Amino acid sequence: MNNYFIILASGLSKRFKSNKPKQFSIYKNKQLFEHSLDKAINSKLFKKIILVVKNKKELKKKYTDKVHIINGGKERSDSSLKAINYIKKFNPTNVLIHDGARPNFSNTLLINLIKNLKNSIAVIPTIQSVDSIKYKINNQTYNLDRNNCYLTQTPQAFNFKKLYVLAIKEKNKVKDEATLFINKD
């Protein structure tokens, strides 16, 4: 088991319109990110879990030694890159990257993501869009066929070495690690 789990929880949640970031909102007596953290710990699938926060000194709760807390960056891509660089020293085989404000994933999903990494360099959970989607280019609006549209979710799973090479090469150009792997066979 050389799997690592990164939880990105340092964002400001600008779209959430609250006085505190979404990942720190209370849901079922815990902060949102803690649900993800507990699921990762309880799965026993990960050698280490990296919690990326804005300021680690603000976290009052102590976690198991398996949990490493690091400070994030200005943008999601900065935080992700910091976490990827941080775990490089442990020589991980696989890494799963998760959004700290999204607590609703199952242990079965974690198992399937890791299992599917045996035959892929990236495994991204998606759901097919049920909504109509419009796309605008230069004041022209187009309809996209929702049968061809998928919404990406987290956690997203990657072969660490492949992710590291692409993340370093692209640095802060992406909003989501899955983007690094699109059409890269």
Q: What annotation goes with each model-predicted range?
A:
Residues Y27, I70, T152:
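Hydrophobic residues at beta-strand termini and immediately following loops
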Residues S18-P21, D38, L45, K62-T64, ...:
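Short amphipathic alpha-helical segments
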Residues L32-P92, E170-K173:
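Conserved N-terminal catalytic core of the sugar/cofactor nucleotidyltransferase
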